[in-house]
Structure formats: C-alpha cells, structure tokens
Amino acid sequence: DYQTGSLRDDFDFGSLQLIRTSAIRHFLNNGRSPRYRFAGLYALRLFISSKGEIVHLREPLYSEIETDLRVSGQKQFDYVNPRNKEVQQEMERACAEHLKQIGAWLAPDELNELPADTTVYPVEASVIIPVRNRARTICDAVNSALSQQADFTFNVIVIDNHSTDGTAEALLQYAQNEQVKVLCPTRHDLGIGGCWDYAVRSEYCGRFAIQLDSDDLYAAPDPLERIVAAFQQQHAAMVIGSYRMVDFDLNTLPPGLIAHTEWTAENGRNNALRINGLGAPRAFRTDILRQIGFPNTSYGEDYALGLCFSRYFRIGRIYVELYLCRRWEGNSDAALSIESQNRNNAYKDALRTMEVQARQALVKRWNHPLNEEEISKFFDWQLTRWDEARERYEALASQVQTRVLPLEDGELRVQYNPSRIVSTGAKVDKKSLKARPCFLCENNRPDTQRALPVMGSIEVLVNPFPILPHHLTIPTRRHTPQDFNRFASLLD
C-alpha cells in the first residue's frame, strides 16, 4: 500500500484510479506545477500524497489483460535504459520538486566532512563475499577477487552462511591461503546484510569493504585499485561502480552496461529516493560502515545503506565497467512472483519512508528560526558541560582590561582580554593558514563543543576564548569562505 516513501514512479496502482476533481484543480492552480510531457500523472500523485491520503480499496472491482509479460529480472532495469532517458529526467524533476515541498530535499553542498580514520587495519581493502549454497559459483568469485592487481594489501572475506550444498567443502581449497578468510557465523538468522555486518566487524576487515556477490565476477584486474582511488580522489564515504549484465557464460544480456549515469552531484542523493537501486559494485569506508551497520535482510540492504550514507556524505561514482553480474537459473531475483515483487517493493518503500522522515527532521533542525531565549539556554547548557570554557568565563571579570584612546571630540574606551593572545597570536600568512585545520569545522572542534543550527546554513557556537560575558561565534555550518553577506540577515 502507499506510504510516504512510495516515491518510485512505477508504483502500480492498477488501471482504475479515482481522484477528487478539487485535488486536480488545486494541483493545476497552485502556481508551481510545471508542464510535463511524461511525468504529469506522477507529479499529480506526489502532490496529492502531500495534501491527503491515498487509499487502497482492498476489493477486486475489474480485470485487465497483462501486456508486459517480461519477468521481474528484466523489468527492474527499465529506469536505466537509455531510451527512457527523457522520461526519467522528467520524473526526477517532479520528485525533486515534491521533496522540496515536503522539506526532505538536500542541497548538494549539505555534506559532512569525512572524519579522520585512526583505526589500525590488517589490510587496506577487503572483498566481502556472503554466500549460501553457491557451490557452483563461489570459487569463481573468490578467484576473481584474488586475481586483482593492486599496489596495496587486500584480502577476501567469505561468510559461509550455513551452506548445505558443498559450498563449505569447495572453500577448503583456500584453507592455506592467508589472503582468504572464511568465516562461519554461529547465528542461524543472518541474511545477506547480517553476513556483511559480521564480516566488517571482524578483525580481518580492511579500511575499505568492497562488494562481490557469490555468483558474480570482477570485469578486469583493476577494479579494487579504481575503487580505492575513487575514495581518495572524490572524498567519498561510499563508492559505487558500474556493471554489465551477462549470462553464466559471460555473454552480454540486455540492458548491457548499467552505469547509473542519471546520478548527478547536484541531485543524485535526492533522486536515490525515487529509483529502486544505486548500482554495483558497492564499497564503503569501514569505520563509517561500522557506525551505521547493515540491516539484517537479504533484500534492499545495500539500498538502505546507500540512502543513509548519502544523507550525510558524498557518494563517489565510477562509470566504467568494473563488475559482471551473472544472471542464471540460480539467481534469487531472476523471475519473482507478483507476491514477492509486492513484498520487496513494500520493503523499499518502507526504507524510503524512514529516510524521508530522517531528512525532514534534519532540514527542520537546520532551518528553525533564531531565538534569543533558546540561544541563552544553549549558552548556559554548554558551559555546564565544558569545564575549560566555563573557567575562562568565570575568570573573565578579573582578566579583561580596558584602554582609553583619545579622540578629537572625546575618548574611546577599548576592552580586550590578554588571555586571548593564544588564539589571536597565530600566524596568518597564506602558507600557515593552508596548513592549519579550520577550528570552526565540526571534525576539528573539541568533543565537548556543541553547535546550535539556525536559519538554514548557520551555527551558533560558544566561544571558548571570551572577551564578552556572552561571547558567541557564528560560522556557516559547512566549510565555505566567510562572506559578510551570508550573515546580513542576522542583523535585520
């Protein structure tokens, strides 16, 4: 049934839909509905969903002849078919407009700085292969990973999820290979996501965790190198590559290369809420992945992480072929029943619902108005939790000095605090500034210093080196060149 997160444009309502005339008129006359060639009904549906409830009448009222007889494994890639590019661009535009109206759209510059990772890892990268009952393909996958050529250390972590078909026996050939770690969880309730979580939290996992499904292959000797380079070059917390659909004998199947070129730096993470997948292979910074954790499911676990990562961090993209996705009779999603499709779609809609709500809360927190009483309470609260700053404020009365400067028509009394020489005596030449971390950025601030977000892009901080009884610092939330015009609205 329809949820807040039912944002995919292929949501199947059936052919019979009843819409209030007043709702259509409201949509057409609201002054912000652009003209659409393909996305008109989709945009109307999103608009109505933001104003009221969409009800599913659970009663068969008509029948129709199904004309699209393709299996689910073929239909699921319609949105990346180049022939549908113009349609998809319109759908993306309609979805972005909807997200803006409901307060869930994230601007492209609203990205967290990547935290420093001081963890000591056994290797730089780990290829993660969850497996259950893939005796026919598991060794192909492991050998594909081992054939990678890289100028850094890497290993292969296989999680055998209680296979019963000879998979465990097939993996015995790697028992003496230090580069291959076969893990056997004691729990019997783990899905693919649970196996991933088990692997990335193990002592063997490297700095980057990189996907390889148990029936797939890497397309060349260098995907690991390309992925790790993308983390560094694109300053990303997650990297997604491109893959080609092939049969078991590696012959190309439609639609061929799936590169997700619809992704843009400007709107990719918003459009991710509309489409049903983000691509493969997927790779993660292990430290951040351990903080978020994998959902313990065997469907949509990767999509859930992509949404969560994109809420806070930049997702890097590689648009050249890295991966071969083999379609064969053993695939779990090659030809799903309508009941399974509905169940999977409902789960992803639920993921999107949670993500929309999380983004709405984030945007609301950023955009709440400036309030003098709230700032005063924040100031007092901060000093109760920051002993060093509180002591400086308590000593302020005895430390502050004044100096009288004579003027032609009177005098000017200047107040200053000698203890601030620690912060004001720093070098300000170009080289020194470039080498010094920005003390206003969240990752470089003391753990005890908190920020109060206000007015969209501004934060309020308590200054730890005061010259005033209530000394505040007001930077932008993101690291940008300071510009007085950004703060002009504060003076109104």
Sequence positions of predicted segments:
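Short, acidic, metal-binding catalytic loop of nucleotide-sugar glycosyltransferases
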Residues: 143-153
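Active-site microenvironments that recognize anionic phosphate/pyrophosphate groups
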Residues: 360, 364-481, 485
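A conserved acidic beta->alpha catalytic loop
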Residues: 160-169
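A recurrent flexible, glycine/aromatic-enriched loop bordering the glycosyltransferase active site
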Residues: 2-18, 261-283
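Acidic donor-binding loop at a coil-to-helix junction in glycosyltransferase catalytic cores
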Residues: 35-44, 298-305
